[in-house]
């Protein structure tokens, strides 16, 4: 039974990832006043399937100087972690209702750094290594602010359990009392998922494709799927944290519809940002985080800690 549950979670995610690639190409196309994919199937709807068949039937080439084991493990690890992070997300019922769901999410996103590092290092190519080092520095840096923002939100929530966030936001979305945190969180998730304008790891003009430059066919497709699964997951997480979906215990379907709509809107905004903004310079990226976001998030975290104490109230206990 548990296997069926896992499959019922994983298969829709992989389908969503497949069609997100199509949506992205369509959105970028229309924003640049062209059509986007429209040959394969009606309105180009079969394009992702054609892409998948093409990628997985090609020969997976491998550089002769690369270290084989790591080269193969890295993409598998990337996709596995991307799918694992969906486990504690309440939609409205999570696959496993963890007491420390938020901590689990943080731990998994930190582990994702290893797949990037291994892929860059195992490729034995200087471009892949530079791309991997950039990606690792960026991901690790932005995780600092993500963790502090999460801490501030959890002080309002009262526990590390993600399901209680639904109850916390029954009357008021957390984006209203903590909108600066929400804005910084959104920008940090852009950086965390290596999306434009923070896609320095895959700067085409200087690094060809970044850490996955030596990958072809199947393994490359795994990296690609991991990236898009992470994008949808981060937006779902943002929805749960700040845009608490409407929850009526008698009609859980309404929650799911509400939740999916908000997640889709956020994902579309990711694509919109990609079409609108140029890439940051590397020093600007780091400056934004260490000089702007970190002091602000720390100050707001102290505010969230001290306010309940000052007003002699206690944070919600669960």
From Swiss-Prot:
GO terms for molecular function: NADH dehydrogenase (ubiquinone) activity. InterPro entries: NADH_UbQ_OxRdtase_su1/FPO, NADH_UbQ_OxRdtase_su1_CS. Core subunit of respiratory chain NADH dehydrogenase (Complex I) which is composed of 45 different subunits. Keywords: Electron transport, Membrane, Mitochondrion, Mitochondrion inner membrane, NAD, Respiratory chain, Translocase, Transmembrane, Transmembrane helix, Transport, Ubiquinone. It catalyses: a ubiquinone + NADH + 5 H(+)(in) = a ubiquinol + NAD(+) + 4 H(+)(out). Its EC number is 7.1.1.2. It is a multi-pass membrane protein. Core subunit of the mitochondrial membrane respiratory chain NADH dehydrogenase (Complex I) which catalyzes electron transfer from NADH through the respiratory chain, using ubiquinone as an electron acceptor. Essential for the catalytic activity and assembly of complex I. The chain crosses the membrane at residues 2-22, 70-90, 100-120, 146-166, 171-191, 222-242, 254-276, 294-314. Belongs to the complex I subunit 1 family. Disulfide bonds: none annotated. One of its GO terms (cellular component) is mitochondrial inner membrane. Its main location: mitochondrion. One of its GO terms (biological process) is mitochondrial respiratory chain complex I assembly. The gene is MT-ND1. It is an enzyme of class 7 (translocase). This is NADH-ubiquinone oxidoreductase chain 1. It is found in: Mitochondrion inner membrane.
